[in-house]
């Protein structure tokens, strides 16, 4: 069956909130083998919403909406759906009871006012309870068309979809679509695509497609099959070949992040780590402590931004700073050695650079970053040249640092 997603809310069109519901729903539908052909956003306008429903059902069998279920006057998704299917709105007493109980749990007094509209549904609807909010969802099935109406807040949308929508749609599922994602760092998108171009160009089931993210590149392998086991058997040989081609540049898979991969490596191999950051301003430490249990390996992080702090906290020599400047390989070395010695760790990583938007010179332009790496007595320095905003430069330097440590201890 063909499906599409229609998100309702002027706040999305204005860019006030990020629409994460479409991404979540698309992934879940793929797992059911239901293809998504269109995604749309419409403001809080009943006529435009009605127009979108008319257009959508001309080309799709299933439309899933999010948003527009609240108590205010501009929350009109159910009303518009009822109009489209020519059904009256009827009060569901169970939903009204649950609505009143929700208010009671929150310590608020209930009054019908606009609130009661959340307990009205198009006649004949399948109702989805909402224990995380006040607005239940519903589904309307009519002449082979299905309208699924969900609340807008993701904390309400996701559990409702998993608990009620998936069981409803499983009977319409024709197999599944399963994806496996390889996460890649250290290769540009074009260089990576060139290496794996035969898979991208010639594969049909599974298909292989690259996507550039802010911090890394992902390579998605997608298979269609009758069941998950069959899909995974199609994905596995392709994954093996891709890993052979890309080697150490593949650092993880699916939703695993670089800091999680590095954290596991450090703990499994018995390494301890400390970091001395200047231009990255604590981003390395912040990333590392995202991984639960990292205290077994990560001992200390110091943000030494000024020259005085580099001298006092890390033991960087004043003569080194005077001769080479703070942004130099020499200072990066002394920072890495200093933090490893003062923290008594196997590894010390340091960053010093010019993140901009000011401070660059022809000799030391904006985006120049030096990483220092002390690893059990061995010291190395890496020079990076990044483009972009201050934030982008700092994030890229952080990812480079984490990846460099990973490669050194593999």
From Swiss-Prot:
Family: Belongs to the CinA family.
Name the UniProt record assigns to this protein: Putative competence-damage inducible protein
InterPro entries named in the record: CinA, CinA-like_C, CinA_C, CinA_KH, Competence-induced_CinA, MoaB/Mog-like_dom_sf, MoaB/Mog_dom
Entry-linked Pfam families: CinA (PF02464), CinA_KH (PF18146), MoCF_biosynth (PF00994)
NCBIfam families assigned: cinA_nterm, molyb_syn, PncC_domain, PRK00549.1
CDD domains: cinA
């Amino acid at each position: 069956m063909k499906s599409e997603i229609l998100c309702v809310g002027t706040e999305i069109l204005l860019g006030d909130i990020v629409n994460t519901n479409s991404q979540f729903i698309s992934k879940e539908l793929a797992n059911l083998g239901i293809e998504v052909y269109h995604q749309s956003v419409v403001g809080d306008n009943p006529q435009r919403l009605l127009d979108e429903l008319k257009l959508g059902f001309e080309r799709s069998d299933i439309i899933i909406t999010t948003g527009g279920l609240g108590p205010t006057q501009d929350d009109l998704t159910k009303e518009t759906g009822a109009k489209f299917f020519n059904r009256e709105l009827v009060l569901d007493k169970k939903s009204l009871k649950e609505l009143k109980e929700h208010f009671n749990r929150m310590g608020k007094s209930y009054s019908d006012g606009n609130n009661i509209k959340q307990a009205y549904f198009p006649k004949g609807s399948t109702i989805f309870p909402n224990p995380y909010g006040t607005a239940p969802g519903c589904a309307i099935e009519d002449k082979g068309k299905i309208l699924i109406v969900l609340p807008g807040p993701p904390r309400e949308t996701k559990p409702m979809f998993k608990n009620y929508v998936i069981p409803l749609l499983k009977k319409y599922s024709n197999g599944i679509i399963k994806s496996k994602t390889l996460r890649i760092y250290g290769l540009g998108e074009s260089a990576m695509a060139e290496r794996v171009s035969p898979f991208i160009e010639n594969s049909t089931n599974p298909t292989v497609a690259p996507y550039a993210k802010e911090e890394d590149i992902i390579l998605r392998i997608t298979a269609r099959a009758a069941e998950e086991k069959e899909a995974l058997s199609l994905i596995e040989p392709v994954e093996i070949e891709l890993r052979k081609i890309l080697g150490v540049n593949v650092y993880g898979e699916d939703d695993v992040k670089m800091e999680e991969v590095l954290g596991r490596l450090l703990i499994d191999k018995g390494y301890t780590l400390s970091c001395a950051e200047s231009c990255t301003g604590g981003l390395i430490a912040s990333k590392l402590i995202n991984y639960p249990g990292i205290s077994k390996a990560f001992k200390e992080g110091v943000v030494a931004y000024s020259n005085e702090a580099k001298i006092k906290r890390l033991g960087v020599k004043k003569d080194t700073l005077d001769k080479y400047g703070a942004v130099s390989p020499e200072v990066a070395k002394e920072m890495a050695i200093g933090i490893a010695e003062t923290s008594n760790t196997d590894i010390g990583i340091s960053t010093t650079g010019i993140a901009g938007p000011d401070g660059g010179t022809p000799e030391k332009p904006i985006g120049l970053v030096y990483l220092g790496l002390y690893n059990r007595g061995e010291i190395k320095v890496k020079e990076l040249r990044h483009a972009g905003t201050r934030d982008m430069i700092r994030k890229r330097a952080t990812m480079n640092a984490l990846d460099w440590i990973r490669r050194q201890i593999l």
